[in-house]
Amino acid sequence: MAALRYRRFLKLCEEWPVDETKRGRDLGAYLRQRVAQAFREGENTQVAEPEACDQMYESLARLHSNYYKHKYPRPRDTSFSGLSVEEYKLILSTDTLEEFQEMNKSVWRKLQEKFAPTRPEEKHRAWTRVLSRPRT
């Protein structure tokens, strides 16, 4: 029975798309990682809680098949903000979020990152230069 569960999860992982624009935050990649952790021994893995495992699979399968989208249809494909799905994908991409974080940095933080030494030995040398200067 564990082999059947493993194969069902593998099939679900194969069908679940991975969004490359969401590096480190994508549900498909996270799902693959969790399945690999849960079934370390592949088909030979002993499932401690078979009912919970089956329930999790069914929940993920419903999400993947858009069960709730069909059960609760929306009259329009818009949101409160009026943005389209493509615009949301662009806004929520990792690159755009990094750009927003860069824009929100203070001038002082930007200067620190630009001119501060990056390697520990360079930091040590910079501090010794500053501390060894004679005070006037």
Swiss-Prot record:
<dbReference type="GO" id="GO:0005739">
    <property type="term" value="C:mitochondrion"/>
</dbReference>
<keyword id="KW-1135">Mitochondrion nucleoid</keyword>
<dbReference type="GO" id="GO:0050796">
    <property type="term" value="P:regulation of insulin secretion"/>
</dbReference>
<dbReference type="GO" id="GO:0002082">
    <property type="term" value="P:regulation of oxidative phosphorylation"/>
</dbReference>
<dbReference type="GO" id="GO:0070131">
    <property type="term" value="P:positive regulation of mitochondrial translation"/>
</dbReference>
<dbReference type="GO" id="GO:0005759">
    <property type="term" value="C:mitochondrial matrix"/>
</dbReference>
<keyword id="KW-0809">Transit peptide</keyword>
<comment type="subunit">
    <text>Interacts with UQCC1.</text>
</comment>
<dbReference type="Pfam" id="PF20180">
    <property type="entry name" value="UQCC2_CBP6"/>
</dbReference>
<keyword id="KW-0472">Membrane</keyword>
<protein>
    <recommendedName>
        <fullName>Ubiquinol-cytochrome-c reductase complex assembly factor 2</fullName>
    </recommendedName>
</protein>
<feature type="transit peptide" description="Mitochondrion">
    <location>
        <begin position="1"/>
        <end position="13"/>
    </location>
</feature>
<keyword id="KW-0496">Mitochondrion</keyword>
<dbReference type="GO" id="GO:0042645">
    <property type="term" value="C:mitochondrial nucleoid"/>
</dbReference>
<dbReference type="GO" id="GO:2001014">
    <property type="term" value="P:regulation of skeletal muscle cell differentiation"/>
</dbReference>
<keyword id="KW-0999">Mitochondrion inner membrane</keyword>
<dbReference type="GO" id="GO:0005758">
    <property type="term" value="C:mitochondrial intermembrane space"/>
</dbReference>
<dbReference type="GO" id="GO:0034551">
    <property type="term" value="P:mitochondrial respiratory chain complex III assembly"/>
</dbReference>
<comment type="function">
    <text>Required for the assembly of the ubiquinol-cytochrome c reductase complex (mitochondrial respiratory chain complex III or cytochrome b-c1 complex). Plays a role in the modulation of respiratory chain activities such as oxygen consumption and ATP production and via its modulation of the respiratory chain activity can regulate skeletal muscle differentiation and insulin secretion by pancreatic beta-cells. Involved in cytochrome b translation and/or stability.</text>
</comment>
<dbReference type="GO" id="GO:0005743">
    <property type="term" value="C:mitochondrial inner membrane"/>
</dbReference>
<dbReference type="InterPro" id="IPR037698">
    <property type="entry name" value="UQCC2"/>
</dbReference>
